[in-house]
């Protein structure tokens, strides 16, 4: 067994490897932000182009959808929202009552109903801790943009934080805009 000793303390290479993997896992989101070109999904551009084509076709054919805002309550199910919506886009906001940026951005989020045909879902992570864990939410608020591609809901974009410019760009890219 290979060991690395520092003074009177020795570590096996296996343990050092595990520690390095834990450190990389912990800092992975920061590393992805610093070096985004190394972590690009090669299909992301194709998916974005396909979504753009679908939205453009809906605009031309005037296939208008509905705008819905849902605040997921204790008994609410996110799966039920996905199965029942007629929209091609769903945007989920993960937040909390105690989160000031979440409360500040809430009206902006709701007002998107005036500009886009979209299903908006507001989830309080304190009421739905399982959803928080399932979606691996690390920051509040977090916005997840889903698009229905070939009858399958695909997570196409995530915005962490309350930056309205980033959120607006995602709405423009992944949601059907209402006529002005």
From Swiss-Prot:
Positions of the catalytic residues: 99 (nucleophile), 102 (nucleophile)
Record keywords, A-Z:
Disulfide bond, Electron transport, Endoplasmic reticulum, Membrane, Redox-active center, Signal-anchor, Transmembrane, Transmembrane helix, Transport
Main location (coarse class): endoplasmic reticulum
PTM note: The disulfide bond between Cys-99 and Cys-102 acts as a redox-active center and is reduced by thioredoxin reductase TRXR.
**Subcellular localization:** Endoplasmic reticulum membrane
GO cellular component: a single term: endoplasmic reticulum membrane
Q: Which residues form the Thioredoxin domain?
A: 29-176
Regions that span the bilayer = 4-24
State whether keyword Electron transport applies: yes
Stated membrane topology is: Single-pass type II membrane protein
Q: What superkingdom does the record give? A: Eukaryota
Topology check: give the Lumenal ranges: 25-180
Residue intervals annotated with topology Cytoplasmic:
1-3
Q: Which cysteines are joined by disulfide bonds?
A: 99-102
Q: Cite the Pfam families for this sequence.
A: Thioredoxin
Function (record text) = Participates in various redox reactions through the reversible oxidation of its active center dithiol to a disulfide and catalyzes dithiol-disulfide exchange reactions.
What family does the Swiss-Prot or TrEMBL record give for this protein?
Belongs to the thioredoxin family.
Q: What is this protein called?
A: Thioredoxin 3
* Source species: Plasmodium falciparum (isolate 3D7)
Q: Which gene encodes it?
A: TRX3
């Amino acid at each position: 067994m290979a060991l690395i000793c520092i003074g009177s303390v020795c570590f096996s290479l296996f343990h050092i490897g595990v520690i390095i993997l834990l450190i990389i896992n912990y800092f992975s989101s920061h590393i992805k932000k610093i070096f985004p070109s190394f972590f690009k999904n090669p299909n992301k551009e194709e998916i974005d182009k396909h979504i753009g084509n679908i939205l453009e076709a809906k605009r031309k054919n005037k296939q208008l959808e509905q705008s819905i805002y849902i605040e997921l309550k204790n008994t609410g199910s996110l799966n039920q929202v996905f199965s029942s919506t007629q929209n091609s886009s769903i945007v989920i906001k993960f937040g909390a009552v105690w989160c000031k940026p979440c409360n500040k951005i809430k009206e902006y989020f709701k007002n998107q109903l005036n500009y886009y045909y979209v299903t908006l879902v507001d989830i309080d992570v304190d009421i739905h801790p399982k959803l928080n864990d399932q979606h691996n939410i690390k920051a509040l608020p977090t916005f997840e943009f889903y698009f229905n591609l070939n009858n399958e809901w695909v997570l196409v974009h995530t915005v962490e934080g309350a930056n309205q410019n980033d959120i607006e760009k995602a709405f423009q890219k992944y949601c059907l805009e209402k006529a002005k």
